[in-house]
A protein has these predicted regions:
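Carbohydrate-binding surfaces of carbohydrate-active enzymes
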Residues: 1-236
Length: 236
């Protein structure tokens, strides 16, 4: 019916508000009360918005393709808008999958692509458990770089991590200064949302084109994503 988009919008927005009010806010408060900080990948199902990242101490993303919409820039944009100097990203999860194929240079390249998107802390994926009795090269998770002492290049891991440490530290010292804001059509996503696909983040992959992002980058500009919540909060 003609009213269906409005009904879907109200339903999706209610889900988003419940995620903010009943999940993100109380867990962040609990973490602070217990002397720690809540790090969260604030996307997926049900549908948090970009500004939902403001409710956690440490937003985290994933996705190395800096010329596309990614959860990485989703998280870093919110961190810039809401003054959070530490924003992390899950890295190397699918790097030359299966395991053992990635080299230290491969790891550096992917890390740099996250730094380009505004990340200031890397969460390496991963270090799978391997029992002592397992034959070499031990157990490995199918989807990740193997960051453990079964890897033949493990001896140079300190050199890799020192580079990543220095870059992460330096990126936290400055102030983000992107010239372009790309408005995320979250309201349109709400109006089209259905129970089997209730994710704002997934919807943005379809609504924010690679061509748009490429145009901005090729013109020499940096950018952040924004949403209605960030504008209302005065972050833009």
């Amino acid at each position: 019916t003609a009213e269906s988009p409005q009904v879907r919008f109200d339903w999706a927005k209610t889900l988003s508000e419940l995620v903010d009010e009943r999940y993100l806010t109380p867990i962040d408060a609990w973490a602070r009360e217990n002397g720690t900080r809540f790090r969260a990948q604030v996307y997926g199902f049900p549908p948090p918005t970009l500004s939902s990242n403001a409710l956690v101490a440490l937003p985290e993303g994933e996705g190395a393709d800096w010329r596309s919409f990614t959860s990485t820039r989703w998280a870093s944009s919110a961190a810039h808008l809401y003054d959070k100097p530490v924003v992390s990203s899950e890295v190397w999860t699918w790097l030359h999958s299966p395991s053992w194929a990635a080299t230290p240079l491969d790891m550096k390249v992917e890390a740099d692509r996250h730094f380009l998107q505004g990340v200031t802390q890397l969460i390496g994926h991963g270090w799978p458990y391997s029992p002592p009795e397992a034959e070499e090269p031990g157990w490995a998770f199918y989807a990740a770089a193997a960051l453990n002492d079964h890897n033949p290049w493990y001896g140079v891991m300190p050199d890799v991590t020192r580079y990543l440490q220095r870059v992460s530290f330096l990126l936290r010292q400055g102030t983000p200064d992107n010239s372009v804001a790309i408005y995320l059509p979250i309201e349109d996503a709400f109006a089209a949302m259905r129970p089997e696909a209730a994710s704002v983040n997934d919807a943005m992959h379809r609504r924010v084109s690679d061509a748009l992002i490429g145009q901005v980058l090729d013109a020499g500009y940096g950018f952040d994503f924004v949403d209605a919540g960030a504008i209302a909060a005065g972050g833009v």
